[in-house]
Amino acid sequence: MPRNEDAMMHLNWAREAEKQRDFLAARMGYLKCVESWKQAGDNAELEKATKEYEAFVRRDPIFEKLISALLPIIQANPGILQSDIAKQAESMDWAALYSYNRPVAREDIYYALYFAGKFGRITRTKKGRSYELRTPG
């Protein structure tokens, strides 16, 4: 399947998953859509898909739950490394986060931290193979 068709398929799946309130599937669909446009080399479509993905993240209740649990850790430990906070967060009780039995994965934590940085809720500064995390101000 050509990358542009692949991207559109993932975009449609993402939109449908969000309508069904399956936010994890929607996130994966948007991510795969963006990656497909990136691989296809279509910058105009990539930009549109990226904007739609970012808009989804702002609506994603899982993102909000994740970041609301991660922000206090960052505030209490300015400069904590992303790899260290991911280890701490993986051991936290996230039972209410998903409506199905799935533990929070490192990718979930990185998703929340990446977009929190992109949206200005935290700062992420490259430090070795990880990122140093701080709250703004």
Where are these regions (language model features)?
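A short, conserved structural fragment
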Residues: 117-126
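Short acidic, hydrophobic short linear motifs in intrinsically disordered regions
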Residues: 79-100
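Residue position in alpha-helical solenoids
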Residues: 16-17, 36, 43, 56
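Short, cationic-aromatic polyanion-contact patches
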Residues: 126-137
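Short amphipathic alpha-helical interaction segments
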Residues: 100-118
